Amino acid sequence: MFCRQCEQTANPCTKLGVCGKQPDTAYLQDLLTYALQGLATYAKEALKESSQTQNVMKRINKFTVEALFATLTNVNFDSEAIKNFIYEAVKLRDELKQMGFKVQETESCKFQPADNLQELVKQGEEANQKIFHSSSNEDVQSLKEITLYSLRGIAAYTDHAQILGQEDEKVYAFIYEALDAMQRNGDLDFWLNMVLRAGEINLRAMELLDAANTGRYGHPVPTPVPLGHKKGKAIVVSGHDLRDLELLLQQTEGKGIYVYTHGEMLPCHGYPELKKYKHFYGHYGTAWQNQQREFAQFPGAILMTTNCIIKPQESYKDRIFTTGVVGWPGVKHIKDKDFTPVIEKALELPGFTEDKEDKTVMVGFARNSVLSVADKVIELVKAGKIRHFFLVGGCDGAKPGRSYYTEFVEKTPKDTIVLTLACGKFRFFDKELGSINGIPRLLDVGQCNDAYSAIQIALALSKAFNVSINELPLSLILSWFEQKAVAILTTLLYLGIKNIRLGPTLPAFVSPNVLKVLVDNFGIKPIKTAEEDLKDILR
């Protein structure tokens, strides 16, 4: 086993994943990546002949992003599911091969999977070497890994957008090109360019997802979300998938069940077409890494959509369900989006026995809401009432050091605005920061993919002030954990955004020389202490 794609490991995981991933599953995910490389070599050419291959490529595009997504941290731990992805990748590759496309074949184009799990794992060990030790140049290898992890993040956003009918062929074209290129030679400049192109494509993937979400559910509006609960049967939904939540809300309507969000589903309360459901009540719990404790205490059924799942405890294993690409061995998977088993389980369970009043948090400050008061914001900046903007967001995690983000937000001066997004917000989402002339000082922009919204807000402000983004009174204080964060970081680099503070630790897959390039060219810096960083930013 050799896995270093997430923030939890300072050195590669070699015996067992810090995330709970077993070595066999890790090797199968490596083998799936290898099989996808072979598929990509043919798909890259087939996509150019879209008039002849439209139907088959529609299936392959959908499959490829799902399969890549399944290899992202905390998504799919089910070896049987990964095995099926491997077989399907080879089947689709051979389907394209039979269509006669001329390609420069690599070893992965000829790969034949074993017919049993044990032998597949052995093949996965070989694939691991080919993927993660393919270059003797550690800097090239580092950039290859940044590209691969970015592809996994891009695939996640593309999958969500695709489900809601938003696609762009150039996203798939890049995925195939990059997967194919990983098997071939390329120097440092080639891979630096590939990383920046990944950022460009991820921006497009996030734009598609933004269009998908707002097109179907409306633009988020400022909405108070209760952190308490209602007496009655209950289902909590975690993950990121708005369509799954919508389907569950439709299927639970009139059944006497309250639906709650968990983790990154919190921003869903701001979407008009979701908040209209009267039984869609409030938010339960905090970020993904606390789910074992929080789910054990939840008196209803649990639905995991996409990531982030961690090993279910026995106390709730019989009442947690997965859907989409997420999976865990022994946990019931809802493949067809008929959530009857979830609903039946919720009706069996006691639910909450009494109402509980608690504080509320505000969501819904995506680009449309913020830009609707842009004139007021600009006036306040010009009048000196808003001195600085901070974007404090990204992934949360269990590793020590993340209290920095809580402390940073708490210490921001009263004439500053904090925008936040993704699950990193749970370090401070319920803090009372007050407001500036009616504008809340803490603005929740949304999920991690809503980095697109934050970028649009920054671009609009830079246009209004007639300066570049880097000249705005804006600082980015980011926390990372998994591959979607890597993809977002490459997008920020592609846009030329500088002086990003990144933590709680720097990625293990970034070599010293690559880090030097990022520091010298983009001013990326590790976080220090909240006090030091605030002093440096505001001096």
From Swiss-Prot:
Swiss-Prot/TrEMBL keywords: 4Fe-4S, Cytoplasm, Iron, Iron-sulfur, Metal-binding, Oxidoreductase
Origin organism lineage: Bacteria, Pseudomonadati, Nitrospirota, Thermodesulfovibrionia, Thermodesulfovibrionales
GO cellular component, one term: cytoplasm
Cofactor descriptive note: Binds 1 [4Fe-4S] cluster.
Requisite cofactors: [4Fe-4S] cluster; hybrid [4Fe-2O-2S] cluster
Protein species of origin: Thermodesulfovibrio yellowstonii (strain ATCC 51303 / DSM 11347 / YP87)
Binding site for hybrid [4Fe-2O-2S] cluster: 240, 264, 308, 395, 423, 448, 482, 484
Cellular localisation: Cytoplasm
Modified residues (Cysteine persulfide): 395
Name listed for the protein in its UniProt record: Hydroxylamine reductase
Intrachain disulfide bonds: none
Gene it is expressed from: hcp
